[in-house]
Swiss-Prot record:
Name of this protein: BRISC complex subunit abraxas 2
Region feature (Disordered): 254-416
InterPro entries, per the entry: BRISC_Abraxas2, FAM175, MPN
Subunit-structure text: Component of the BRISC complex, at least composed of abraxas2, brcc3, babam1 and babam2. Interacts with brcc3; the interaction is direct and may form a heterotetramer.
Primary subcellular site in the record, as a coarse category: cytoplasm
Chain segments carrying region Important for interaction with brcc3 and other subunits of the BRISC complex: 221-242
A GO BP annotation: mitotic spindle assembly
Residue ranges, compositional bias (Acidic residues): 363-378
Family matches, as CDD domains: Abraxas_2 (cd23524)
Biological function: Component of the BRISC complex, a multiprotein complex that specifically cleaves 'Lys-63'-linked polyubiquitin, leaving the last ubiquitin chain attached to its substrates. May act as a central scaffold protein that assembles the various components of the BRISC complex and retains them in the cytoplasm.
Residues recorded with modification Phosphoserine: 377
Length: 416
C-alpha cells in the first residue's frame, strides 16, 4: 500500500500546525484507488500487480483538542457527526500535531484509531503524525511527519507518503492522480449553472463533442492506414517486376555483346589475308614512288619545259644502257613519247601540266630546234636498237619512278 497527498493540502496542514499555539488534530479527506502496475522482463513475460493507493485531497481541522472524544479515549458520535457532516464518506484517516515528541503513536491514539475504524467502517484508516522540533536557541526548526496504518498485528506499520509536486518527480503523477474540488462554493456554483455545461452523467458537453470528433478522426485514420498498406503492397510488387525486367535487359545486353564478339572473331579467322592485302599493295606502290631520286627537285624551271625527265637520273649509275639513252627531245619530234603517257617529272607533277604551263615558251623555240633534233634522235635510236634491242624497256622499268597520272594516282610502267 502507498499514500499520496496533494501539495496544497500538505502545505495547508503544515501552515496551520506551525501557527497554532498548542497541539491540534483533524480529519483527512480523500479516496482509495487500485492502481495496476505492469512489469515486463527481458524475456517478454509480463506480470501485473495491483497496488492500493490512498490519495489525500483535503483536510478538516477540529476547533480544539478532545472535540469528539474524552480523556479516556471514548468517542462521542454526535460531536463526530457535527464535525464531519456530509463529508463522512470521504474520510480516509485523521491526523495529530504534537510538539517536541517522538514519532510514535501513543496508547490513547491507538484506542481512538480503533474506535474510528469501527464507527466509520473503514478498514484501511490511516493516521498522520506531525512533530515540530526546535533547538534551544530557536535557530533550527524541523517539521517531521510519518503515516501509520495500524492493524491487529502491528500498530506502528509505516506507509510511504509521496507528494506529487515536491522533489524531483515526473509529470505523470499529475495524470494518474486526480484531485477533486471539495469547496462548498464551487459545488453550489456548479449546481446552479451546471446544466449549461454538463449533461446528466456529469460530463461536460464540449468534452463529449471533442471525443466524438476524436473517434471520427481515429476511424478515418484507420481507413487511410488500410489504403496506405494496400498501396505499399502494390508498389512492392511493381518494384519486383521492374527489378526482374532490369535483370533481363542486362542479361540480353551481355549476350548480344558476346555474340558480336564471337562473330568478329569468326570473321577474322575466316578471312585472315583480306585485311593485309590492301596494305601490301599500298606499300608496294609507296615503295615504287619512293624509289625515285633522293635529290630534291630544283625550284628553277628549265627553258624547255616540255622535255621528259633525263633517263640518266632514273637509271642506276652502273647501267650499261645509260650512255646509250637518248637525250631530251622537243615536242613533236619523231622519237619523243606521246604526252598521253603521263610521264612524271620526278617532283610529283605530270608532264602534261608542265606542257600546258610552258606553252608560251615552246612556240617560239620549236622551229629552231626541229631539224637538229630529228637528225640526232634518229641516229641515237638506231645505235641503241643495234646494241641492246631488248634491254631498254627493262632498264627504264627498273630505274624510272612511278608515273603520276592526272587523277593523282601512281602507276607502274608497263612490263613491271
Amino acid at each position: 500500500m502507498a499514500a499520496s497527498i496533494s501539495g496544497y493540502t500538505f502545505s495547508s496542514v503544515c501552515y496551520h500546525s506551525a501557527n497554532s499555539n498548542s497541539d491540534h488534530e483533524g480529519f483527512l479527506l480523500g479516496e482509495v484507488r487500485q492502481e495496476e502496475t505492469l512489469n515486463i522482463s527481458d524475456s517478454h513475460i509480463g506480470s501485473s500487480e495491483f497496488l492500493s493507493v490512498i490519495e489525500v485531497h483535503n483536510h478538516e481541522p477540529c476547533a480544539q483538542l478532545f472535540s469528539f472524544y474524552d480523556y479516556a479515549g471514548n468517542i462521542n458520535e454526535e460531536n463526530l457527526d457535527r464535525i464531519l457532516k456530509d463529508r463522512r464518506k470521504n474520510v480516509i484517516g485523521w491526523y495529530r500535531f504534537r510538539r517536541n515528541t517522538q514519532q510514535q503513536m501513543s496508547f490513547r491514539e491507538q484506542v481512538i484509531h480503533k474506535q474510528l475504524t469501527n464507527i466509520l467502517g473503514i478498514p484501511d484508516l490511516v493516521f498522520l503524525l506531525f512533530s515540530f522540533i526546535s533547538t534551544a536557541n530557536s535557530s533550527t526548526h524541523a517539521l517531521e511527519y510519518v503515516l501509520f496504518r495500524p492493524n491487529r498485528n502491528r500498530y506502528n506499520q509505516r506507509i510511504s507518503l509521496s507528494i506529487p509536486n515536491l522533489g524531483n518527480t515526473s509529470q505523470q503523477e499529475y495524470k494518474v492522480s486526480s484531485v477533486p474540488n471539495t469547496s462548498k462554493n464551487y459545488a453550489s456554483v456548479i449546481k446552479e449553472h451546471g446544466t449549461e455545461f454538463f449533461d446528466k452523467d456529469g460530463v461536460m458537453k464540449d468534452i463529449r463533442a471533442i471525443f466524438q470528433v476524436y473517434s471520427a478522426l481515429q476511424e478515418r485514420v484507420q481507413a487511410v492506414c488500410g489504403e496506405v498498406d494496400q498501396s505499399e503492397r502494390v508498389r512492392e510488387k511493381i518494384q519486383e517486376e521492374v527489378n526482374k525486367l532490369k535483370e533481363e535487359i542486362a542479361l540480353r545486353k551481355r549476350n548480344s555483346a558476346e555474340e558480336e564478339r564471337r562473330i568478329q572473331e569468326a570473321a577474322a579467322e575466316t578471312h585472315p589475308d583480306s585485311s593485309t592485302l590492301p596494305e601490301s599493295s599500298h606499300s608496294s606502290l609507296t615503295g615504287v614512288v619512293l624509289s625515285g631520286p633522293t635529290a630534291e627537285p630544283s625550284l628553277e624551271r628549265p627553258v624547255n619545259s616540255s622535255s621528259p625527265p633525263i633517263y640518266s637520273t632514273a637509271l642506276p649509275p652502273d647501267s650499261p644502257s645509260a650512255i646509250l639513252l637518248p637525250r631530251p627531245q622537243a615536242v613533236g619530234s619523231p622519237g619523243h613519247p606521246s604526252p598521253s603517257l603521263g610521264l612524271g617529272n620526278g617532283d610529283g607533277s605530270s608532264s602534261d601540266s608542265l606542257n600546258r604551263q610552258a606553252t608560251g615558251q615552246e612556240d617560239h623555240e620549236e622551229d629552231d630546234d626541229d631539224d637538229e633534233d630529228e637528225d640526232s634522235s634518229e641516229y641515237e635510236n638506231l645505235v641503241s636498237e643495234q646494241l641492246q634491242p631488248t634491254s631498254l624497256p627493262d632498264a627504264v622499268a627498273l630505274g624510272r619512278p612511278a608515273t603520276l597520272w592526272p587523277d593523282g594516282d601512281a602507276h607502274s610502267p608497263p612490263g613491271s
